[in-house]
From Swiss-Prot:
Entry keyword annotation includes Magnesium: yes
The protein's required cofactors: Mg(2+)
Compartments it resides in: Cytoplasm
Gene for this chain: xylA
Protein name as annotated: Xylose isomerase
Amino acid sequence: MYFNVEKVVYEGPSSKNLLAYKFYNPEEEIAGKKMRDWFRFAVAYWHTFNSRGEDPFGSATFERPWFKKDPMDTAFAKVDALFEFCEKTGVEYFTFHDRDLAHEGLTLRESNKILDKVVEKIKEYMKSSNVKLLWGTANLFSHPRYAQGAATSPNPLVFSYAASQVKKMLDVTKELGGLGYVLWGGREGYDNLLLTDSALEEKLFARFLEMVVEYKERIGFNGVLMIEPKPKEPTKHQYDFDASTVLYFLKKHNLFEHFKLNIEANHATLAGHTFAHELRVARLNGKLGSIDANRGDLLLGWDTDQFPTDVYETTFAMYEVLENNGLDCGFNFDAKVRRASIDPEDIVYAHVSSMDAFALGLKLAVKLREKVKPMIEERYSEYNSEIGMKILEGKTTLDELSSYVEDLTDVRVKSLKQELLEMVINDVIFGGR
């Protein structure tokens, strides 16, 4: 037993039990769907089972009981820990990079054989468990070979190695029944613009994605392909800067129909956006596929990957998810306990509190939408006028619009009512009305 806790269950808002769900009731129906279907919560293998608590200024602080002397023993023990964790928390999905499951061998062939052994153990567990794979991905950023990029590397052998890793992980994701596959270009970008052939690297990145699409279709993988935007870190400037940048890139290279986005909260703040902003950009373009649920520290300039317990932020996020009628995949907790939180049980506390924060956010977002929709309709109501409809329907010209306003002495705009909106938000969150 790796986690010294009882099974966490829903007990409702009045429960005094800290390790009980107060708001996340997987069977409760909200806005036409069960909570479990709105969320599909997932535990991230890398932060939860791989992290040792290192940071740039200090060594490992986590002595996890699944860390063994032999790397294969560790790999198998991590699988045991995964399924125990999911059983005790009710988390029904997981996500992983290829190198999260097992160490890298001397050759790619050897690495794939090692990976296959761990995948077989996961498949055995899955036969008697409800735990499923949300999405898979390949680690194309940790190994020194990727120091200058993977798909955008100046070395075609590195490009080929990265392509081979993705090929294998598409196979594994399909084999495990994953709902999607994510590509994150942590090393796809530049540190020095003068040393960068930007046109060539853009072409390489597009060609890489074209081959991913071709292979996905050839093997009959029915999951959704997704790109995860991030503006920087580890690269100074990444090509997948934010949702708008990625969507433009996909449009330019005729890849738009093949990909959706996996939006991460902390990546949004690093790009100078709110989490809800990035969700909306993806949603309005029909490209909101999945969410990496976490939060950043606005006073720090790096990816802190904290657990998402801010109910304001979860409410605004769930507003966008409601408007999107859900997600293709789900909510992956790309978050890590703090370096000083050294007990395995801290991982449980973090996930339970975050799942509750999103469940409460969903309930509040339903109420908020009821209050805000009429305010939005009132704000734009003047476009229901004759001239407003002509503008919207493309039935007017600059000449007609000029003649319409040239003799007006005043044009008044209605009050924005932002202060009223802020009152409404607090009334919903704290008053439950």
